[in-house]
A protein has these predicted regions:
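Polar-ligand-bearing catalytic/cofactor-coordination segments
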Residues: 2-5, 26-141, 173-231, 235-240
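Hydrophobic alpha-helical transmembrane segments of small proteolipidic membrane proteins, enriched
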Residues: 2-38, 152, 158-165, 171, ...
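Glycine- and Gly-Pro-enriched alpha-helical subdomains that act as flexible
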Residues: 142, 148-149, 165-166
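Alpha-helical transmembrane segments of multipass membrane proteins
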Residues: 147-151, 230
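Conserved helix-loop functional segments at active or binding sites
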Residues: 150-153, 199
Length: 240
């Protein structure tokens, strides 16, 4: 791998990959935020804020054979902007302040999406189980991967570089496995909103679907950028 460290830092292809990932990720974030801002100005007909939507769904929606109070142990408010998430470890559902407090179409969709994750866990979703298995490795894999990749370049050690690529591949697998999890959660969210009568108009349905689609695109962007980066590392290894 002679002189490969110089190739890594000054290779035009590396700059192209970096710019592409920034554009893709930035574009996805811009789209989700603009979509959220649009539908966060539209009140939902049920006049329910995000926390109330989550509570209604917990009481009325289906979670396999598990009661809603077991599928979602607690609904809490957390700081941050669009920091909403469902934690499968303790089955807690966290909503950001804006989502929890506003009775809008956007808040309704975001809250329902997180409840959708609770339904996935209760029903034993295979994709969610696969993603959960990858979480520990995906949390530390990329950081360790960069150390091996940079070390392999500096030391001209093909073995180290290869290990780094394999470790980074775990993060790529996690990103790819996340896609069906998020898409399925969104599908469940729309179905639950309709089945429980929270959605009462085509406008609300279209708005919720727009929100959920925009959210899904952020995960598509993450997967695409991870794949592009992995392909660059593989290309670099082959020509070094």
């Amino acid at each position: 791998m002679e002189h490969s460290e110089n190739v890594f830092f000054f290779d035009p292809l590396y700059i192209v990959v970096i710019v592409a990932t920034l554009v893709i990720s930035g574009g996805a974030q811009l789209y989700i935020r603009s979509t959220y801002a649009r539908w966060n100005r539209v009140p939902n007909a049920a006049a329910l804020n995000g926390a109330q939507v989550a509570e209604v769904l917990r009481e009325r929606a289906r979670f396999g054979n598990r009661p809603g109070q077991q599928a979602i142990t607690v609904i809490k408010v957390v700081p941050g902007d669009l920091s909403d998430h469902f934690d499968p470890r303790d089955r807690s559902l966290s909503l950001s302040q804006g989502v929890a407090s506003r009775p809008t179409v956007a808040s309704m969709a975001v809250a329902a999406h997180e409840v959708g994750h609770a339904a996935q866990l209760a029903e034993g979703s295979a994709w969610m189980q696969i993603r959960s298995l990858l979480v520990p490795a995906a949390m530390v894999g990329p950081q360790i991967a960069y150390l091996f990749i940079i070390g392999g370049l500096i030391l001209n050690a093909t073995g180290l570089f290869t290990v780094g690529i394999l470790l980074f591949g775990i993060a790529v697998l996690f990103s790819v496995a996340t896609l069906p999890v998020e898409i399925q959660a969104s599908q469940k969210a729309l179905a639950m909103l309709q089945e429980t009568g929270i959605i009462t108009s085509k406008q609300e349905h279209d708005g919720a679907r727009s929100m959920l689609t925009a959210a899904a695109l952020t995960y598509v962007a993450a997967a695409v950028t991870a794949i592009l980066t992995l392909l660059y590392y593989i290309t670099l290894a082959r020509r070094s």
